[in-house]
Amino acid sequence: MSEFKCGLIAIVGRPNVGKSTLLNRLVGQKVSITSRKAQTTRHRVMGIHTTDEAQFVFVDTPGFQTRYTGTMNRAMNKRVRETLSDTDVVMMLVEAGRLKNEDRQVMELLPKDRPLILVVNKIDQVKDRAELMAYLQEVTAAHAFTEIVPVSAKQGHNLDELLKTLQAHLPENAPLFEADDVTDQTERQLAAELIREKVFRLCGEEIPYGVAVAIDKFEEEGNLRRIFATILVDRDTHKPIIIGKGGEKLKTISTQARLDMERAFDSKVYLEVWVKVKGGWADDVRMLRSLGLD
């Protein structure tokens, strides 16, 4: 009888390549925020998927930044490097048909002493098989990978094959978490991330990714969560964009975030959200530490 397998699996890749979407698909529910805006993932987020034979502990990482060099981005890049050094398997995500310089720069960081699984995402968007084969040849010439698995995170295509491939490379270990655990994030952390996701989705390109959410108060009373949060922006011009005419945009952000929280926490949620201008917060080490971003 085969032994139970369990290990840490890093999910790495350039910004906005689909890492958070893939993590949420593999786990079966939202544990990492997603949006069309690059750099929405700032924290290492563990997503956990357990079967009768194995436990997959996924560590999502920020997209490795090569364009921006501020304090926050340096801290996030440091976390990517730390994640690569303490996981059992590294899974790099690329976009089918598009090998960018940023992808090559991430490849340079990949360790040589553990299994490297290349996950080619968005294969549903490539209609020409010859084009896909040419792309795969380009990728394999750029770096040596242990395995290559094509998937569509958005459509859920070929994820069973990906899990099978990952399981083959996991070490034999007892499970690290309970069978029904799906993340190590606290409800407080997830609440902040869900609010930030709605800002990105509803404000589009009007707001840069320099937005943070601080949870000022989180109270539990039976089947009710009372959450008071502040959206931090670094420019005066961003505040009215998030608030919207007559406060309608902020109301929509709050409502959508609250509904997601109620689904995630399986409880009623009372949510109050404010917007505050805090210039230079992304370069303030003390502020980053208070937000868990140092």
Regions found by a protein language model. Give the residues of each.
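Conserved G1/Walker A P-loop phosphate-binding module
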Residues: 1-78, 82-84
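Residue-level signature of catalytic and energy-coupling elements of molecular machines
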Residues: 12, 16, 22, 45, ...
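Conserved glycine(s) of the Walker
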Residues: 18, 158, 249
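Conserved Switch II/interswitch segment of TRAFAC-class P-loop GTPases
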Residues: 84-104, 113-131, 154
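P-loop NTP-binding site
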Residues: 187-294
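Canonical P-loop GTPase G-domain recognition
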Residues: 115-117, 124-183
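Conserved, well-folded catalytic cores of nucleic-acid-processing
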Residues: 29, 48, 52, 64, ...
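Switch/connector loops and helix/strand junctions flanking conserved nucleotide-binding motifs
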Residues: 65-68, 100-101, 126-130, 157-161, ...
